[in-house]
Amino acid sequence: MTQMVRPPDDRTTTRRARTLAEVCDTLVPSVEPPAGEPAEFYARTAGDLGIAELLAPDAATGALLDALGERGFADAPLPERTALLRDWMLRGPHAPALRGLCSEVLGAYYSLPDAGGRNPNWADLGYPGPVSAPPAVAERLDTLRPEGDQVTLTADVCVVGSGAGGSVIAAELAGWGRSVLVVEAGRQWTPADFRQLEHDMAGMYLRGGQFSAEGGTIGLLAGSALGGGTVINSMVCLDPPAEVRAAWAAEHGLADVATAAFDEHLASVRARLNVNTERTVLAPAAEPMVDALDKRGLAWEAIARNCADDDDARLCGFCNAGCQQGSKQSTDRTYLRDAARAGARFLTGTNVRRILVDGGAARGVVGTLTRPDGSTAEVTVHAPTVVVAAGGIETPALLLRSGIGGPAVGRHLRLHPAYFVSGVYPREINAWSGQIQTAVSFAFHNAAEGAGFLLEHVTLSPRGWAAQLDWTDGAAHKREMRKLARVAPWHGVAHDHGSGEVVLDAEGEAVVRWRLADPVDRRVAALAHVELARLHHLAGAEEIYTFHTPELRWRAGQDFEEFRRRLDAAEHEGVPASAHQLGSARMGADPATSVADTRGQLHDVRGVWIGDAAAMPTSPAVNPMITTMALARRTAFAMAGERVSA
């Protein structure tokens, strides 16, 4: 829980700044190059790129810097600084903050562009950087630009959030003649803004992409833009399995989800997004994966993607920083345009803080608009219908701040923890190139007591690799970075059996609590690491990495079975990342265990509907975009028959 702290005085600020600069130069120091290696690469420091000046330490990082300052960290020689950082990363109260700072520093060091749009380290990593320039202009959705410090708007329906769920509901209701206002916390991005730079990604993600569950147990990624996560996701379009749909019908009361009626919602979504496999081109990182699967006789399939027919795989690889081609059929290019044509309005840069309720019914929302120039305004939207579609983290937070939704708000959070195992191969993979995700295997889908994981390859870029590698010392980290071009990264995405929760801190902001405590989930985590390592070994990897701290690694010539046993026995908390936050305001028949009824309307407040992945009763067991959109369309149809008086 975040605590209120007194702002540091000038002397404390100066000491923190000096300590932070030395932390950065300890993480990325000047070291002697190995024989035959590029001298400038090994000599360059974080200070040479001004990394410390870019950082804005939060309270936890400030406490870490104060503790290091009390130890005289800034005046110690490099070996002592290195040993202290390594020790504190492994144990003690500051370990989560230090690991987070380490990832932030290393990620920035290998991604920060200069005035020419390039990073000085890229050439020595074999990384080409951007492969094309953005278009000079691109089509934009018209957005409201209200003036003054008090803004009042009215609508039939206020949709909070514009991602996979909110966009569908906005388009459907606007198409049926409702006055719809979409309120989005993020800004609008277009292909003209997408420079194919990792450094730009912070503005497209919730909390800049630097976000973890309490205690650093799992990293969290969620979109924050007009179009939500669909703007920056990897375009994986998978239908929910039949067994999931059957369970939602039988155990949670969503009877129609197991019928042909829901098939129609799925088909409509796929058609609007132009979901297809014809434009899927197997990416370099997928090649050793499918080779190993073939050798083991395990099935895999091409991933269906929401792309235009003119999608060019040669220009792909940067989807997580936006699609410069405009080929990705994200909701800002599909459903939000449909909504706009039907008269919907859009207000961006607005953080909704509370839902207005009177007499047990919705009356609108209040929030804060922050303009590009930094000026702010208090926004009040009067609307008898409110759709909460702010994502699996912010949707329950808004309900909690509003004091509505019942006892299940924030509970039952599923995160689809992804466990990464990477192989270093004797040839160049160049995993940053090609379409981000092109192949999936369901071979381990039910690996443990009805739970399991999907096997998928992912993209790899300097920032991501630098931030995830286990740091032992500055010289070793630089040596590992030099292997970047030969790395094939894969992950096992678990459909979690246990759950976490979303609560509020003292300032009313969302805090995610999650532990890898469920026995089934712990078994799946071990299986994911073991099976991915086996596949890398079969595919001919010379080294196999995980993201454990301290590291777990296998090198050619070592006993692989011993490595496999170590993976099986390891503690896997603190290792995974989550790009899918689900179920935290779920639908169901029982108000004690669900937030909304089986159609999506809150049990306790008329006119407030859940319209995003938070509404899912449990994990959908696959990448959730298509399921989210189909459920949203289903909810929109239910809303169309609803008559809520103003």
Predicted regions and their residues:
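Rossmann-like flavin
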Residues: 78-98, 226, 230-313, 492, ...
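Glycine-rich loop(s) and the adjacent beta-strand/alpha-helix scaffold that form part
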Residues: 172-181, 186-198, 219, 225, ...
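Conserved redox-cofactor binding core of oxidoreductases
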Residues: 108-145, 255-354, 362, 543-574
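Flexible, low-complexity segments enriched for small/polar residues
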Residues: 5-110
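N-terminal Rossmann-like FAD-binding beta1-loop-alpha1 element of flavoenzymes
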Residues: 155-182
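FAD cofactor-binding and catalytic pocket of flavoenzymes
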Residues: 2-3, 7-10, 233, 251, ...
